[in-house]
């Protein structure tokens, strides 16, 4: 059957649910050769992955993941993006997670070490003194007790080990770059998902809705950011239960001054750690804090802690300058 699937992909035909299920079951179980893995990943990429293909693959990844049980999901949000924007910004979605938790939300943060940037979410968490190699039970306790838990992707998606080598050897983005944010082990009902290409916003919004997410924002900054941009307009896909809307926003809509890209760029792990500490300790009054507040606001709005993005920015800044986000960081450092 795998040869038939490869043939179909070379003819740029979409796979059926049954074919995609067969393919990903065998892919994740390590039953395909390196050549077959390379062929199907490039075949899907060249054809363009359909909503059904992405949704089916995401369901299989979630089924095979180590589950994190969170009893109260009423304000549980995931802020994981695809990464890969190559603009070298600091870790805004990770810093936003501390802010959202400090403001009263619960964040199931899902991430990995750097692949395309100098500093991934796992790298910055470690640099900040937070233990990332935790069991599912420990992450569940972090979320319940502190409001933020970090799930280090390799530990919660062990079957991914069967494709790591091939993905590195291929060296281009594949379906796996978008599956991470769609396969949160805590199964959060709310999500803010940044994507590296505008063309992904609409299909991934539909995928999230099909996967049962209650409310979500899928965002792409038109400057290339996989975040809500402070330097340009942002294309947004919004899920509100059964409704989907697509629209564009800009920083000025929320009373923020537009920044230049160099103002929000980071560097290596040490540099990004210092930026994170400066913001969370309430010492930064630059566009970097505006950038964090803007992205935090979308998460605060999606879980219903505020009624508008502008109110979310105000709450995020209040949380930052009252050092409530930094308190979350200290609790995670001391977690045992």
From Swiss-Prot:
Pfam families, sorted: Glycos_trans_3N, Glycos_transf_3
Cofactor(s) needed by this chain: Mg(2+)
Residues that coordinate or bind 5-phospho-alpha-D-ribose 1-diphosphate: 81, 84-85, 89, 91-94, 109-117, 121
Binding residues for Mg(2+) 2: 226-227
Binding sites annotated in the UniProt record for anthranilate 1: 81, 112
Transferase in keyword set: yes
Classification via Gene3D superfamilies: Nucleoside phosphorylase/phosphoribosyltransferase catalytic domain, Transferase, Pyrimidine Nucleoside Phosphorylase, Chain C
Pathway named in the protein's UniProt entry: Amino-acid biosynthesis; L-tryptophan biosynthesis; L-tryptophan from chorismate: step 2/5
GO biological process, one term: L-tryptophan biosynthetic process
One cellular-component annotation, GO: cytosol
Highest rank taxon of the organism: Bacteria
Binding site for Mg(2+) 1: 93, 227
Function recorded in the entry: Catalyzes the transfer of the phosphoribosyl group of 5-phosphorylribose-1-pyrophosphate (PRPP) to anthranilate to yield N-(5'-phosphoribosyl)-anthranilate (PRA).
Full protein name: Anthranilate phosphoribosyltransferase
